[in-house]
Structure formats: structure tokens, C-alpha cells
Amino acid sequence: FVFNQPVKQKPSPSAIISHSPSVQETIMPQTIATVREIRIAQPKPFARGQISGIDKQPVTGPIEATPTGLAGDGVGDPRYHGGADKALHCYAQHHYEHWQAQFPGNPHFRAGGFGENLCIEGTDEWQVCLGDQWQIGSARFEVSQGRQPCWKLNERFGVPDIAAQVQHDLRCGWY
């Protein structure tokens, strides 16, 4: 898929009043958001002797999506990142306005700053639900969990408690 693709969501079965096959067939996917950037990175030295793939860079053309992530993307610590349940990290692009107001002049509070693969416009944690199925181009994804921010955000942004603030403000992103 490529950037600026609409994100379409098929309503969950629990939202269907009648479960008859003929009714389910008439429910059409809805455009709920837009992918503004697709970002990938390979792990590199980071902080505290660790490596990280948080410094994701924009992709300019089509990219292959697999069950475990995007082609060319990697994670530094597979115990906590990546895999089928954390294949793509999505982050609402409008959250950056909040962080820029909180921390003016910090260069990392911009698209990609949180290590997201997909910069999303038009939805956020208040509308996204676990189990939502998204169609982006020819790829289908299912929202599996919210992000659990770790210490690497504190290091990246130079703010000792930003991981806790991200959780408190409910601006974590999702997989």
C-alpha cells in the first residue's frame, strides 16, 4: 500500500442488528481515516547500550505489508516490539499539536516521533477499538492492542516522564 490511502473499516458484527447473511452482505466498509505517512527503520544503537528501531523514516513509494510488519522495518527488542500482534504501530497525527504545545522546540515531536509505522489522520484512540478491521489498499489489518509506552520514549524526547504522560493523556497509539 502507499501513503494517502483511505483507511476503511468494516463495522464489527456486534454492531449488526440482524445476523442474517443477507443483511451482513449489505454492510459496506466506511472510510474512517487517512494514512498520511508510512515509516520504517532498521534498529540502530540508541541509549543505555540498547538498540531501537524508533527512528523511523518516511517511505516514498509502495511497500509490502506482511503478517509481522512492513518490508524493511525492524525492531530493537523483539521481546516487547514487533510480531503478529504488534506488526504496525499507528499514531494519530493530530496528537503532535498537543505535544508541541507542551514541549515547544523539541524537534522529535513531529510525525514519526513516537516510532509509528503509520501516521494516521482522522481517528485516534477514542474511536479505534480492539478488533477493528482496517483495509488499507490491498492489505487488511486488525487492531490488536493499545501501545504500552516504554522508557525509550523518555530517552528519545529527553523528557524523563514522557512515557507516563503519554499514558496519562491517553495518546499512546495502537497496534
Say what each PLM segment does.
Residues 165, 169-175:
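Extended, acidic-biased charged interface segments
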Residues 11-14, 138:
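A subset of signal/propeptide-processing and intrinsically disordered low-complexity segments
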Residues 1-3:
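Aromatic (phenylalanine/tyrosine) cluster motif
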Residues 25-155, 161-162:
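Electropositive, beta-rich accessory/interaction domains or terminal extensions
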Residues 13-27:
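Short, Lys/Arg-enriched N-terminal segments with co-localized hydrophobic residues
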